Amino acid sequence: MFQYEELNKQFIGGKWQEGSSPNVLENKNPYTQKTFTTFRKATADDVDEAYRAAALAKKKWDAVNPFEKRTILEKAVTYIEENEEAIIYLIMEELGGTRLKAAFEIGLVKNIIKEAATFPIRMEGKILPSTIDGKENRLYRVPAGVVGVISPFNFPFFLSMKSVAPALGAGNGVVLKPHEETPICGGTLIAKIFENAGIPAGLLNVVVTDIAEIGDSFVEHPVPRIISFTGSTKVGSYIGQLAMKHFKKPLLELGGNSAFIVLEDADIEYAVNAAVFSRFTHQGQICMSANRVLVHSSIYDKFLELYQAKVESLKVGDPMDPDTIIGPLINSRQTDGLMKTVEQAIEEGAVPVKLGGFNGTIVEPTILKDVKPFMSIAKEELFGPVVSFMKFDSEDEAVDIANETPFGLSGAVHTSNLERGVAFAKRIETGMIHVNDTTINDEPNVAFGGEKQSGLGRLNGEWSLEEFTTLKWISVQHEKRSFPY
């Protein structure tokens, strides 16, 4: 068992050390607002040291037998299982996740590591024919090199591991910069896990800092070949452009504005349960959350009535209480921004069915009906327990409303006719959409990613293996060939 006091340092070159900056990052419980640990921030020099350590350790990792690599990754899963209760506590303490959310996140983490553990023995190549006599074309799948990972605050343990584990499994070195609000769950906890599993010193490095301290050095550094970023579309756009400027491949998992669509033949009670889960899991702080609930006009009032009743039953408050479903937002800035969004929506004509209170970082559920596509709340990502209800009269209208957003991450459609649901889903401009399910889905072997402004690239399974590797063509001329001169 470990304590969080052990995890408040940088992890660079296989060593736990203080950041070089005199400036301190306070790690606060978002519910109590109490500081439970502090970090000395990493500087650009620390980032440089971390990247160089990763590049050096990657060469040692190259020499490790693929089956030994698999065993090391499997040991990481074992360590998580042995310390699961402590990790649950950390998730509740650091990011205000409920016990239910923490257990859900840990399950996702274990699954993605198990998938990544198969990567070392899936580094397959090809032998291809040649137009030239006596020539053999070999195609090798090789690690990209070093990967820089920048993770968010909402599911920090999983969304860090979603890039870290596959990158390691594919043979790369990694430098991880967790969000400054969640430096342990998104960063040093992961370092502890892989240190215990036995990866080479320096293969994984964690730098805890903020942009004010390091500027663009994390992305601009010459060592990393890939920058994997999960976060807002605004920041992701900047990071993607900066990475491309320096000829690095950006992997971007960005914002969403998912529509949960209920056709007139849906199982209403089942759809209500799925819709509530799609919106209020982890206080709505999920990129796949159903910001918009689109309901056919013939069942709109009935659905809204049942939805409100279900939401009223959700306990709001202390995430340490096992009965709590809706805990705190990560910080007061998120609360203030959400409050302004709700106020603006009401000014624009949205009708509050349930207007929740705002108290510090605790936000009670808010349900707005008769929201129109032109309203700002219908166009933006909502990172909190606020939901917009919209009415439609036909499938074509529902498709138009669902697609009237710059985002294209996830979605859901409910109907008693499954093939009708699939045909409808194909018309929605998202990377993922689910028939008779929630908008929140992530499986370790299925392609995950968005369209439009929701990101670039796909993660999980074979897609992560492709993203974190490159192909090298080596030709072998077995027989002497003739040349024109």
Swiss-Prot record:
Catalytic residues (UniProt): E253, C287
Binding site for NAD(+): G231, S232, T233, K234, V235, G236
Listed PANTHER family: BENZALDEHYDE DEHYDROGENASE YFMT (PTHR42986:SF1)
Family as reported in the entry's similarity comment: Belongs to the aldehyde dehydrogenase family.
Disulfide cysteine pairs (residue numbers): none
Gene3D superfamilies: Aldehyde Dehydrogenase, Chain A, domain 1, Aldehyde Dehydrogenase, Chain A, domain 2
Entry keywords, A to Z: NAD, Oxidoreductase
InterPro entries: Ald_DH/histidinol_DH, Ald_DH_C, Ald_DH_CS_GLU, Ald_DH_N, Aldehyde_DH_dom
NAD in keyword set: yes
Pfam families according to UniProt: Aldedh (PF00171)
An example molecular function term from Gene Ontology annotations: benzaldehyde dehydrogenase (NAD+) activity
Temperature curve summary: Optimum temperature is 37-40 degrees Celsius.
Induction: Transcriptionally regulated by SigD; part of the yfmT/yfmS operon.
CDD domains, sorted: ALDH_HBenzADH (cd07151)
pH dependence: Optimum pH is 7.0.
Function (record text): A benzaldehyde dehydrogenase able to act on substrates with 3- and 4-hydroxy and methoxy substitutions; converts vanillin (4-hydroxy-3-methoxybenzaldehyde) to vanillic acid in vitro. The physiological substrate is unknown.
Protein name: Benzaldehyde dehydrogenase YfmT
Deleted gene: phenotype: Loss of conversion of vanillin to vanillic acid.
EC number: 1.2.1.28, 1.2.1.67
Record field: catalytic activity: benzaldehyde + NAD(+) + H2O = benzoate + NADH + 2 H(+); vanillin + NAD(+) + H2O = vanillate + NADH + 2 H(+)
